[in-house]
Amino acid sequence: MGKLVFYVALALVVVSGVLFAPEHAGLAIHPMDQFTVEALFGGAHVAWYTPTNVTLWMFLAIGAIFVLLVLGSANRGIVPSRAQSVAELAYGFIYKMVEDVAGKDAVKFFPYIMTLFMFIVTANFLGLIPMSFTTTSHFAVTGVLAVIVFVAITVTGFVLHGAKFLGLFWVSSAPLALRPVLALIEVISYFVRPVSLCIRLAGNIMAGHAVLKVFAGFAGALGFASFLPIFAISAFYALEVLVAFIQAYVFTILTCVYLKDALHPSH
Amino acid sequence: MEGDLAYIGAGLAGMGTGIAALGVGNVAANFLAGALRNPSAAASQTATLFIGIAFAEALGIFSFLVALLLMFAV
């Protein structure tokens, strides 16, 4: 049965590719068009308060998280339902990560890190739905997330340790002559953290989606062989599902690493 | 002429992503080599693996960003 469905779908793809082949060959879509921010209710001008497709997909992500975590665990069954077990899995996964990477006393930051992970992973997965919009592919979105992480961790460090937090930059295990040079490098690497957090997430997601659209654009150039790119697209799509999860994981685990620095700044 | 040079620069920056791929492969290969020697310790080190991959990959993504800027912003 499953095989039959697969072959029928394959035949449909091939036949429709042959039937609807465009007259003039050429790249049909520009790979970067999918990232255009548009006002939801018309109007060309986008101000900071205008509801755009970014706003819409962010709220959809929040709604999806609400459905999974709040409604999914509302029954609190001894034998968990499917939604409840997914919610519990996610909770346990992040809790263990915070405890392992940042230490036991970092657990009071767990709600923030859980929120961060769930938002990024949901936004990434929603962006993989065809015709949807990927909010995390924008440097503005990931930049705000990264700057909040950076500010929160710096403030935490100074509140907990005061001026001793600056010891993070003073590598006391190194020879005295090297310490100023190392301090300079440490300061630079400290301030590059939010930049790299922001660019890693947005760059990965944007690059992956652009690759998918480049292959989709080949369909217009191949004439009646326009069904061929769907195989490449399927393969890349599977990779993108993996990347969507791994990048959310990497963002949160690096947050945990930085948090550990703020809680225990001794070098 | 300046636009053409920007395209050449974008191509050169694109090489950086490939070189970052070498770095990521290096991290994964060494992890696997270590994990096969001591499989019982491997599971506890996957977080380190991902952090290492993320750091190696970040620089490749930086050069990808430079390529994008040269293509679309310059």
Swiss-Prot record, chain B:
Bilayer topology annotation: Multi-pass membrane protein
Highest rank taxon of the organism: Bacteria
Pfam families, per database record: ATP-synt_C
Keywords: ATP synthesis, Cell inner membrane, Cell membrane, CF(0), Hydrogen ion transport, Ion transport, Lipid-binding, Membrane, Transmembrane, Transmembrane helix, Transport
This protein's GO CC annotations: plasma membrane; proton-transporting ATP synthase complex; proton-transporting two-sector ATPase complex, proton-transporting domain
TM helices/strands, residue ranges: 5-25, 49-69
Gene Ontology molecular functions: lipid binding; proton-transporting ATP synthase activity, rotational mechanism
Site positions (Reversibly protonated during proton transport): E57
Matching InterPro entries: ATP_synth_F0_csu, ATP_synth_F0_csu_sf, ATPase_proteolipid_c-like_dom, F/V-ATP_Csub_sf
Subcellular location: Cell inner membrane
Keyword Chloroplast assigned: no
SUPFAM superfamilies, per the entry: F1F0 ATP synthase subunit C
Main location: membrane
Subunit text: F-type ATPases have 2 components, F(1) - the catalytic core - and F(0) - the membrane proton channel. F(1) has five subunits: alpha(3), beta(3), gamma(1), delta(1), epsilon(1). F(0) has three main subunits: a(1), b(2) and c(10-14). The alpha and beta chains form an alternating ring which encloses part of the gamma chain. F(1) is attached to F(0) by a central stalk formed by the gamma and epsilon chains, while a peripheral stalk is formed by the delta and b chains.
Protein family membership: Belongs to the ATPase C chain family.
Family annotation (NCBIfam families): PRK07558.1
Role, per record: F(1)F(0) ATP synthase produces ATP from ADP in the presence of a proton or sodium gradient. F-type ATPases consist of two structural domains, F(1) containing the extramembraneous catalytic core and F(0) containing the membrane proton channel, linked together by a central stalk and a peripheral stalk. During catalysis, ATP synthesis in the catalytic domain of F(1) is coupled via a rotary mechanism of the central stalk subunits to proton translocation.
Protein name: ATP synthase subunit c
Species annotation: Ruegeria sp. (strain TM1040)
Lineage, broadest ranks: Bacteria, Pseudomonadati, Pseudomonadota, Alphaproteobacteria, Rhodobacterales
Gene that specifies this protein: atpE
